[in-house]
Amino acid sequence: MLRDKYGVDVNFKLVYPLAIREPEFFEGKNFFTYFWWKMIDMKLKARRLGLPFSLPPKPDPICQNTFTGEVLKDQPFIFDICHFLQAIEHDKQLDFAYEISRCIFGGTEDWHKDNNLIEVTNKLGLDFQSIKNKAAEKEEEIISQIKKNQKEQLEAGHHGVPLSVYKDKFFFGQDKFNDLVKELKKDGLNI
């Protein structure tokens, strides 16, 4: 909205999900004490925003035991999709993140399969095969970029996502988006 409607420069920076960056965060959290409430919250927010939302994702990008909180060692999906996204030209990364999130959490089965990724990249005018090749060929560079983004995220003051940073302030979560807009208005954004 801010970028497309008001010309705000959004510098999207991909980080690995918290379960990958800080698996210990989920120790002792389980379906009944944590995940159940998160799912209810996400479903309500999606409904309020008019977004498609279906749980669980098929497959879930993070392999995790929701009854114990344990993040599994084997992660067959999250690194591939993160590296694929990071291989996309920077000005299209946010668009891809938006579209693939709609697939993952909107009920698209096998969102990670090439045919679904091709559909998303085609929609955005991107070349699936060249992105896939770049993700494979430049994997170490991509991992370094993501780690740099994670370092900058922590330096901004928070480890969560979504995180917006403007000047010296961070805005964590969808609920803080309106606070970010207020700050932009103070600096002259005409909405």
Task: Pin down the residues of each PLM region.
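Structural alpha/beta surface segment adjacent to cysteine/selenocysteine redox centers
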Residues: M1-I104
